[in-house]
Amino acid sequence: MPLVTLNDVLPQARAEGRAICALNVTNCESAKAAMMAAERENRPVIIQVFQRLFGDDKARYVAAMARSLAENSDLPVVLHLDHGQSLEQVKQAVEYGYTSAMFDGSKLPFDENIATTQEAVRIAHDAGMTLEGEIGHIPTTATEDLPLSTPEEAAEFVAATGVDALAVAIGTAHGFYKKVPTIHVDLARKIAEAVSIPLVLHGGSDTPDEKVREVVSCGFAKLNIASEFFQVFLDAVIRESDKRAGAFIPIDIFMNPVTEAMSELAAAKIRLVS
């Protein structure tokens, strides 16, 4: 089926107390693994591409792959720009045929974040896309002093910008944790009560499963997974290389078990929040 937007999958997921997995992809294997997992679990999936890949043609190539995968599936598939850093990147996403984008203005002063996100929403909506915003910067490693979001900020931001989904800081971090994180589930619940749109949990990798389930039940309908997905890829490549001991094998055949390993991880994450 054709690619869909966040509004086609997230509101229903929130109403059901479930979430849709958003898997970061960078190449054919990761995109295929995400789709294989969705098919295996019979659930929608969000294929998202990190903003760095918009610096060259990789984001365009991934868009073509995602579109082909979606057209050959009966499942809803969203193609999403992850952590867009500028309005220009949102415009690139429009040009490349993405159906959704994130503008991450969380490092900006709050008023400036609102103003720039308003423009990002206008660009996205004019193109028939959805737009995810962010408040309360989500760091790359967990620290004692995480800048947490507040229900008041969330409500003000949503009302002022018209975003379709909102990422908030509740204690998660991108990457792998050096110690068990403090996930503020009560805060997550209060923020969800303050806004009517779906919320987004960034830093889903390595966050304890029980905490992910609790947060999803509050109204967080999009779960981002990147680091764990990529680590499985790297581990599988090393494992397969060791098996071959330098012997020749066609690359596509070599990559089959790597893709399967990624798909298994993705399927487990989908089951976790379904």
Locations of regions flagged by a protein language model:
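Short glycine/proline-rich, acidic loop/turn segments that cap or connect secondary-structure elements
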Residues: 227-247
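Active-site-adjacent C-terminal substructures of enzyme catalytic domains
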Residues: 180-182, 197, 254-259
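Extended, intrinsically disordered, low-complexity segments
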Residues: 240-274
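Short catalytic-loop micro-motif centered on adjacent basic/acidic residues
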Residues: 20-24, 79-80, 102, 199-202, ...
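Short, N-terminal intrinsically disordered low-complexity segments that are rich in Pro/Gly
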Residues: 20-27, 52-55, 255
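Alpha/beta enzyme core
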Residues: 4-16, 28-53, 59-74, 84-195, ...
